[in-house]
Amino acid sequence: TVLGVLAGAGIFNGVTKYVAQYHDNPQQLRRVVGTSSAMVLGFSTLMALVFVLAAAPISQGLFGNTDYQGLVRLVALVQMGIAWGNLLLALMKGFRDAAGNALSLIVGSLIGVFAYYVSYRLGGYEGALLGLALIPALVVIPAVIMLIKRGAIPLSYLKPSWDNGLAGQLSKFTLMALITSVTLPVAYIMMRKLLAAQYSWDEVGIWQGVSSISDAYLQFITASFSVYLLPTLSRLTEKRDITREVVKSLKFVLPAVAAASFTVWLLRDFAIWLLLSNKFTAMRDLFAWQLVGDVLKVGAYVFGYLVIAKASLRFYILAEVSQFTLLMVFAHWLIPAHGALGAAQAYMATYIVYFSLCCGVFLLWRRRA
């Protein structure tokens, strides 16, 4: 994930936005695709040089020794495939090609799993690590084929070019990606440390268990957001049309996630037995709190994609900082009182308040002249 963000300069949501916005303007679309290609090529090449030239310190930092310099240099090449694969997927999302995007991911993952197995058999532990990077990188193969077959854009559009205005707009998404990679991950690290200090690492494991199940099904549910919601909102310019789309999305998303969450709650004992072990049975008491938070978190995602679609860096930073602050405030209040249960309660309380704030800000924006 980190490689994908850094190699592609974090611009993929921006690519989807501007492709959707200019899908019926060939001249502007060519500028978007060409500038995106140049940025991806530049950042991925820079990453490759850093990995090749600094292989020894990177190996030391990641593995505690310098024995993996060869692996680091191979990953320097593989990350270029990750970047280009993500760029091609972002282009398809801009055209709302859900089928092409899904097929590319499925076929690419199957090829990647085979490559992982071969790498593991040939290289053991180092081969397995390389194989993990190959899985997302090899998506580039079916993505290229799918883009050619769909014919949405000529491959000549991918020739790197440069437009200062577009590069500046896309750079906003680089900042967004960097902010996202810092705020919530740091908040969760701090929550884990607080929980371990107040109680034990066993409590951390209980909370992490329910969080991992939550993340798994939420990824499945929100996968369609970047394929449908982001390009759709990017194409809309009238406040009335945007409002209608947001309300329609909320009317679909909230009941769907509530139904999925209720199903997970009903099957919580089976999920613990299937995915974890009897040591995690205490986790069952956390599900209700976590799942309520999940429903409202996904509801807030709808507003988040509106912010991304309009490339509003100011509101994006405000949203990320708000989530971080709310998590920290509720965590320091509830974790000392209730342990792992308090962590789940802090998560739920955060997204009750955050979703309410999103609704309030949206209503104010809608009523502005």
Q: Where is each model-derived feature located?
A:
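Interhelical loop/hinge segments that connect adjacent transmembrane helices in multipass membrane
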Residues: 128, 132, 143-186, 236-244, ...
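Hydrophobic alpha-helical transmembrane segments
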Residues: 69, 73, 102-151, 321-326, ...
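Helix-terminus/linker motif at the lipid-water interface of multi-pass membrane proteins
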Residues: 59-61, 182-217, 270-276
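Interfacial segments at transmembrane-helix termini and the short loops linking adjacent helices
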Residues: 55-75, 201, 247, 266-295, ...
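Helix-loop junctions and terminal segments of transmembrane helices
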Residues: 8-24, 94, 210, 214-238, ...
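Membrane-interface junctions at transmembrane-helix termini in multi-pass inner-membrane proteins
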Residues: 80-104, 292-319
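Membrane-water interface segments that mark the loop-to-transmembrane alpha-helix transition
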Residues: 8-56, 70-71, 239-261
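Alpha-helical transmembrane segments of polytopic membrane transporters and translocases
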Residues: 1-8, 38, 176, 191-194, ...
